[in-house]
Amino acid sequence: MDNPSPYLQLRIPKPDKQALSFCDASVHGLTEWVAGLPKANLGETARLLYQCLVELNQLETPASNRMKLMELLRPEVLFVCKHLEKHFLNQSVVLDERPRKVANLCQALQNHLAIGYKLIVTQEASQFRKEQPQPLAIALQRSLHSMFGPLVRACQLYCPVPDGLWLEMHLVYRTAVAFNLQHIAVTDPLSHYDAPHSVENAYLAAMLLGCARTNQMRQNAIANLAEAIEGWAPLVHLQTADSPASLFWIAIRQDAPPRLKSLFKDSEKQYLLGINPTPLLDAIEEYLQADASKRAFARLPVTERLTPEQIQHLGAAWGDTAERTFRRIPAQGTMTICLGMSAVHYFLAGEKDFGDVLKAPDEPRNANFASKKKGAPDIWANSFDAQPVARWEPGEPMEEIKYSSPETLIADNNLDKYPVYELLIVNHSPSGYCLSWPREVPSQLQAGELLGIQDTAKQGWSVAVARWIRQVRGGGTQMGIELIAPSAQPCGLQLVRKAGESSQYLRALLLPEIEAISRPPGLITPRMPFQE
């Protein structure tokens, strides 16, 4: 970090306008404009905020005034982005045109928000005074926080991080270090935590997210992590790369996230910063080992929505330095898959419905609509439309009704209910495959989803799980799957309660023992009601 002026490398426009077109460039003028935003129409509000930020970033104004204006706009931008998320999250991994435009709008809003704060960074840094460090420290922290939003959104959409985002974050942090401001406490009213914040903690939150293997997490889990990680950053230390406790390295002059230090080539081992997550890993271990009743008192700040399974994944991502067990081998060909427990159960059972597997099919019952008393008058006989219609003349066309047999209807319904997909094989290893979706991705697909896979139509179905999902620039959507078992026995499982009624039979899979890897027999069940 020998460059004394990293802030000069930030990507920002050169302001050249003297006034704003929509309001006076003052706190009073912008406050009135914000009060008039059509909050009930989020789309229009987002459009107006976008135009406002673009103009404001082209405005020539002192840093102190720009900071006041940005602080007025920041909560409005975060509010709009938060409420627009429902239009593109928890949908298909590959978004349709309209959701994609909404997601791009949110990214653009927070990108321009970050540009506004980076303009303040360059203004304050060029006239910095040690006796007044707060303005620059706040601008640095706000810049990182504004860039954190697009990073989280890219993770949730399993798409590449915007070009230059990592490098801009590194430059902002290097600016803080150059002025010795990385540990200065600043307040942030929009944070999830009341504790004082710092530039280093904001930077560490982004770096931790970058090496959390979010492509193996579901969208809601990533949102929960983004909310909690801000409070975890103080448990992580930035240090020199040559320290033995540095599990991850950051190439601070490259547009890249942190990586395990074992993944760096010799030619890349310069201008590095180390991450020591050991205190955080210890806190995670303590939390997971504590009784559920005592976890609220653990030193790990955790939101209620972050589950122990998700925390366990994070502990492995930040602490597991084991190399890949098997090498990936490029491959060609196709593979057939089905998604979800219901579909996997159906195909493993030889395309039988769950009721047939239980050997308890529903028995047909005949409805009897006869009157209780023979000879009793029909109460509907005097209805205005109860008389027979005799207006049809011979030779008039008649509508033909085509009936389908029940077997045909059931087969057609099952094809719609349990679709199969043919995917391209990118590479494989003994433990799994990398597959590519050539067409639309079903909305059901998420990391952790149970899969059935079939190499050829003559072979049986194997059981697998989707470990990660990513969107490749120009290459569509790819998915990494891990093989769980070469086969499984479909069955029904019932939760028997000592008091009260037992549960209904639910789908489950019996996994065979695999002696070659010393794995005992297993059982896959739905999460509810079969909890540990």
Label the model's feature ranges.
Residues F179-S371, A376:
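Extended, domain-scale alpha-helical bundle/helix-rich regions
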Residues H313, D320-G460, W468-L483, S487-A488, ...:
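Short strand-loop-strand
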Residues S5-Q9, K17-A19, V27, T31, ...:
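Intrinsically disordered, low-complexity regions
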Residues D2-M207:
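Long, leucine/valine-rich, helix-dominated scaffolding and oligomerization segments
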Residues P490-L495:
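A short macromolecule-binding patch
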